[in-house]
């Protein structure tokens, strides 16, 4: 009886191991397939969109900070959104970060969950897409406007944001400008902080009630940075936050303030 029980137990253990292996293999295969689909969708979206970078006429630019004059010859994005809106009516803008692979249209849903598991074409995909916080209006900026995406290991989506914590990236001031375009305007944001942190909700606070609290909020975000960008902030500034997962346990965060609008 003991021998029979031993054999039965071994068979059960073997079956359990086989089931676990099969499920793990299927899960891994699905993730690989999602990655391939994401690369294909990204290629199609970027390839079918007319995205230009144009140095604007200075008289057309509303300068919000004197720091802009250090970047006065920096180009601004000019994007044809017609085709993007036809592909996905949730499209709200385009974001580009120099020195990274971040150069994508971003979307917005009614929550911050949908585009974590859906691609630009709204197909189910665990790699997700780049999306604006549902609380934000990109054409009527909150104190803090937040854009999210997964940090993929192949540097797709926001995976390459990890570059911003490396000396090679932050010592090159040409990388410090984030470009945003919408159907109605194009904007330049100047980076003032980059860091990794344990998951929290503080840095994605969208609006702050008083000037004093807002200035304190900005100061805390600035002090977290791995590098001192030498950027001054006032309580009147509007900031942009790019947020992504980092090594499965942390968040990769990049903050910048609005310095020019066209």
Language model segments and positions:
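N-terminal Sec-pathway targeting helices
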Residues: 2-19
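Solvent-exposed, non-transmembrane regions of membrane-associated and secreted proteins
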Residues: 24-262
